[in-house]
Amino acid sequence: MKWSAQATLAIVVTLSITATNHAQGKTDVVTLANGDRITGEIVQLERGRLVFKTDDAGTLYLEWDKLSSVVAKRIVEVLTTNGSRYLGSLGRTADRSIVVVTAGDEVPLEMWEVTLITPIGRSFWRQLDGSIDAGFSYTRSSGVAQLNLNSDTVYRKLASRTRLTASLTQTQKDDGSGRDDRASLETSYLRYPWQRWFFLGVGRFESNESLGLELRSQIGSAVGPRLVNSNRAQLMLGAGLAVNDERGVDVEPRQNLEALLMFGTSFYTYDRPTTNLDINLQYYPSLSDAGRQRVQLDAAIKREFWKDLFVALTLYNSYDNRPPNPAADTNDVGVVLSIGWTY
């Protein structure tokens, strides 16, 4: 009986805590510009859009510049345009402003200054964001069919981000002649140890038959500033080093040490329909093979056409002035139209 009473008490306490946490999760309040108030749970603010979960209306996507105020009793991480980070609950002050209530202070902020809000203590799965898209084309005159797949998954924690991306292009010709398949898998860890500066570590595996590359295994790191961080755009520059092992077609393996210069920018709008433009450029001048240069350009524009579904136009350009196999092409360029889903 004693054990039964203790077990019953433990179950009651557990259910009480669960119910309390559930109730707390739905006590955030947003006020629209017209004065309407909505009660729910902040999922995330990023790229000018607040994801807000409600019991009655499901998940809402609210434009940040169309809100008057946001109040949250839970602890959240707040990032501003100048790179400052705060942990605390959110209180209301004047319209178009919030106050971050920290352990020993209150920090007033204009809402246009806030670029990221992430609740602390979310489960692993709820901290994942990403997208997947696919495209297919067939040209009858040339007898060429092409399948394209892309995926991007991001896991966010306090002042850091872990990302996994994958890309695959398979080409089939009716006459069975040479293939132009390409594939890449990349994982990266990005952290902001200083207010505006980031550290990036990257591991990448790729193959490209057009460039005579069976497999390139690469690790690298870079540091740099985030020059722009707003609800409409981001701009980052970085520099570092990369080492790789290359296995070319019909050639001996070789290892390389390269410098790494990188540029990344994003532009986005959440006036329906939502649109994102992302451009990433990496330049690799070789330090172990003087004169060799590699460039990787990836650009994509995505436009939402229904809820979490989007259409994407992607451009990629892989350049190597000295590919592993001297007989291979030095450039591989492609444009892909695809349909995808964000999660």
Task: Walk through the language-model features, giving the residues of each.
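Compositionally biased alpha-helical segments
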Residues: 23-156, 163-167
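Membrane-embedded beta-strand positions in outer-membrane beta-barrel channels/transporters
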Residues: 131-133, 146-150, 182-186, 216, ...
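Transmembrane beta-barrel strands of outer-membrane/channel proteins
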Residues: 132-138, 151, 164-170, 185-189, ...
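Transmembrane beta-strands of outer-membrane beta-barrel pores
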Residues: 136-140, 157, 168-172, 205-209, ...
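Solvent-exposed loop/turn segments connecting transmembrane beta-strands
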Residues: 137-146, 173-180, 207-215, 249-253, ...
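Repeated loop/turn-to-beta-strand initiation elements of outer-membrane beta-barrel proteins
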Residues: 158-164, 192-199, 230-235, 268-277, ...
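Detector for outer-membrane/organellar transmembrane beta-barrel domains
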Residues: 232-285
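Outer-membrane beta-barrel "beta-signal"
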Residues: 331-343
